[in-house]
A protein has these predicted regions:
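Short glycine-rich anion-binding loops that position phosphate/pyrophosphate groups of nucleotides
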Residues: 48-50, 119-121, 166
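Structural signal for conserved beta-strand scaffold positions within catalytic alpha/beta enzyme cores
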Residues: 9, 25, 66, 93-96, ...
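ATP-binding N-terminal substructure of ATP-dependent carboxylate-amine bond-forming enzymes
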Residues: 1-82, 101
Length: 217
């Protein structure tokens, strides 16, 4: 077993590739979740689109990382932005919209060009619409299928950098060096690690933001 650990998986289908790596529990009903939880000491999940109720149920029996609250925050773009603002971490101007009229008002406030995104489930450029002119408002809202969305303004930037951090059970934090990401058509195509030409002050600034964020969630 990798690192001496026995792996267990909770999946929706018997065809899930996790079945090649360890015992797999199929379905997400209460009985299966209980069996999975009873058989697991520590649990983590693959993506922010995981059902919060499943994480809540598993947490009753097992240690789950990241926490249920972390999942609740990160699977909704509006809640993410609100938290960043509360922690004084800079982010693009934004506004939640639930109708064409709200989108029109948001554009008046934020300006164009801007990006309209679904508040949930979007990834790799999916669930997004680049609005360049007011003539595209109806088309953009139709692209969202009437779902709650978030309008984000553009910001000028030189490059995109990411930081990964880990926290121990004792609360200690460790940070990886910053990495540089390159996207094409909304999809991450290349990550260079470590990023080049990074000053110590920039690394420390990113670590400061991460410290505030990770201790909050």
């Amino acid at each position: 077993y990798p690192l001496g650990h026995q792996m267990r998986f909770l999946a929706l289908s018997e065809e899930d590739p996790s079945s090649l790596l360890g015992k797999t529990y199929i379905n997400s009903n209460a009985d299966v979740i209980k069996l999975f939880s009873d058989d697991s000491d520590v649990v983590t999940y693959e993506s922010e689109n995981t059902d919060v109720s499943i994480v809540r149920d598993v947490s009753k029996k097992s240690n789950v990382f990241p926490s249920e609250r972390s999942l609740h925050l990160t699977q909704h773009r509006g809640r993410e932005k609100e938290l960043l603002c509360e922690l004084n971490i800079p982010c693009a101007p934004y506004q939640i919209v639930n109708s064409v009229s709200e989108l029109q008002n948001a554009i008046k406030s934020i300006g164009l060009p801007a990006i309209l995104k679904t508040t949930r489930d979007g990834y790799d450029g999916k669930g997004q619409f680049h609005i360049k002119s007011e003539s595209q408002i109806d088309e953009a809202w139709g692209h969202m299928s009437g779902n709650e969305s978030i309008l984000e303004g553009f910001v000028k930037f030189e490059r995109e950098l990411s930081l990964i951090a880990v926290r121990g059970l004792d609360g200690s934090l460790k940070y990886y060096p910053l990495v540089e990401n390159t996207h094409h058509e909304g999809i991450l195509r290349l990550t260079v690690a470590p990023a080049q030409n990074i000053s110590k002050s920039l690394q420390k600034k990113a670590e400061g933001y991460m410290h505030s964020l990770i201790n909050e969630i």
